[in-house]
Design a protein with these regions (language model features):
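Residues at alpha-helix caps and immediate loop-helix transition turns in enzyme cores, especially N-
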Residues: 20, 39, 102, 123, ...
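Active-site phosphate-binding strand-loop segment of PLP-dependent enzymes
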Residues: 118-171
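Conserved PLP-anchoring active-site segment centered on the Schiff-base-forming lysine
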Residues: 75-129, 133, 140
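Conserved PLP-binding active-site segment in aminotransferase class I/II-type PLP enzymes
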Residues: 1-80, 84, 106, 128, ...
Length: 171
């Protein structure tokens, strides 16, 4: 019998500076919990500044928006990728429902990809098999791939990006 190996889940923690508590208190003290407020506005601007610096020194014109939930972010990303009711979207099977609900909100079909033993995240080999299976059965590739970094464990970004690039599917 194979020996089981424990996978430790990453628990939420504060940074060493504990600045998170300061900003949460400031948001409540100034009543800027909803809508967004100056901290979120500053974060959006700082992230846009960072995202718009091209490696060659030129400036890009990328837009940044903070959303209230990951579900909203996935939903917006799927819309931006042009997902339509007839499309299929690859998503890992072991995740929170927020990863697949936006797919069904748009009338598309989730294609669930099983996980690796080591990380519990999307298995790149099974992803590629599913992509080829969907192409054979439907005549087209899935429209998008939604990998998830579960419990603080990163998915194999290099392998998943290579597969996405091979089949020209946005991750």
């Amino acid at each position: 019998m194979e020996e089981r190996k424990t996978i430790y889940l990453c628990l939420a923690h504060m940074s060493e500076s504990n600045m998170e508590q300061k900003y949460v208190k400031e948001a409540f003290d100034t009543n800027w919990v909803v809508p967004m407020g100056p901290n979120v506005n500053a974060f959006e601007q700082n992230l846009a500044d960072f995202a718009n610096n091209n490696s060659d020194g030129s400036k890009l014109n990328r837009k940044v928006v903070c959303l209230s939930a990951g579900t909203a972010a996935v939903h917006l990303a799927l819309i931006a990728c042009g997902v339509q009711p007839s499309d299929e979207v690859c998503v890992q099977s072991f995740t929170f429902c927020a990863s697949s609900h936006p797919i069904t909100y748009l009338g598309a079909k989730p294609v669930f990809i099983d996980s690796e033993r080591e990380t519990w995240n999307m298995d790149p080999e099974l992803l590629e098999k599913a992509i080829l299976d969907r192409k054979e059965k439907t005549g087209k590739y899935p429209k998008v791939i939604i990998p998830v970094a579960l419990y603080g464990m990163p998915y194999d970004c290099g392998k998943i990006m290579a597969i996405a690039n091979t089949y020209k599917i946005p991750p």
